[in-house]
Regions:
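Short hydrophobic alpha-helical runs that function as membrane-insertion/retention elements
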Residues: 3, 87-88, 178, 199-202
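Gly/Ser/Thr/Ala-enriched C-terminal appendages of enzymes
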Residues: 165-170, 175, 183-280
Length: 280
């Protein structure tokens, strides 16, 4: 991933911060890419701030998830700091703070008429969808549109199919269905296989914590050192565990692709051959 060259003391001081940054964010970016592969052309939004490993972990995770393929984040600070698009929905507490779900949707529509995407599972999801449609019809009369609904619990495949039927039947064929609730690439694959009618995936906990593999074992090892005469001498770390034996040399990575431009593999090679180990 990275090669550092410089005085040995200065290079050593960089080990801990580099590994801390690169290991965690590489892990999250990889997880994000896996999730995006499962989602296909559907947008993925990172929803993980509340479950992330502390404030700094949340910021790094939002950035890495965006690098890995998410379209936006619900983390407002990360959006501001890194220029990531910010998206999200209202909370269950908004619904619960009113006398009824319908009233909550109506008040939200008054405040945000051009951005009405309702969270419909606070009490009863099917009834929530019907209430969202009712408010959507009111919006349509005023020249606005119902952006969509969000499903956050229950059988997401069944509920999304029913939601699509209800929305289409009411004339909201362009309304979006967002799904969340501890999603992962495996769950997204399963939901798609079941024919779920989900347009956007909100992925949080299992993305920002890299749930199935919470740590990446990247290392930082000395590969070569230059003597007082300017000659490079290679160094190798030996171990009874093959995976912990380091590669000596001044290393670089070459990536190979096929004729269609698709990735085949990477080759790690030594840039300094024996005949040119002396560097100016």
């Amino acid at each position: 991933l990275l090669r550092i060259q410089g005085p040995i003391v200065e290079c050593q001081l960089l080990e801990t911060p580099l590994l801390n940054i690169i290991n965690f964010q590489s892990l999250i970016a990889t997880k994000s890419a896996r999730i995006k592969c499962s989602a296909g052309d559907d947008p993925v939004i990172e929803f993980g701030l509340r479950r992330a490993q502390g404030p700094n972990g949340a910021l790094g995770a939002s950035r890495a998830a965006y690098v890995g393929g998410t379209e936006a984040t619900s983390n407002v600070l990360a959006a501001k700091k890194y220029g990531i698009p910010v998206k999200g929905t209202h909370a269950h507490s908004w619904i619960m703070s009113f006398g009824s779900e319908l009233e909550a949707f109506e008040k939200y529509a008054l405040a945000m008429p051009n951005n009405c995407l309702f969270l419909v599972d606070t009490y009863d999801t099917i009834e929530g969808i019907k209430n969202a449609i009712q408010v959507g019809l009111q919006l349509k009369k005023k020249g606005h549109r119902l952006v969509g609904i969000r499903l956050d619990s229950g059988d997401l495949a069944y509920l999304s199919i029913e939601a699509r039927k209800l929305l289409d039947g009411a004339g909201f064929t362009d309304a979006l269905i967002i799904a969340s609730n501890d999603l992962s690439e495996e769950i997204i694959d399963s939901l798609k296989h079941q024919g779920a009618k989900i347009n956007i995936w909100g992925v949080g906990t299992k993305l920002v914590t890299a749930y199935e593999q919470p740590a990446l074992g990247g290392v930082y090892k000395l590969g070569a050192i230059r003597d007082f005469e300017g000659i490079w001498e290679y160094r190798i770390k030996l171990s009874e565990q093959i995976i912990k034996v380091s590669n000596p040399g001044i290393l670089q990575v070459r990536r190979f692709k096929n004729t269609e431009g698709l990735f085949i593999g990477d080759m790690i090679y030594n840039t300094a051959q024996p005949e040119d180990r002396k560097r100016q």
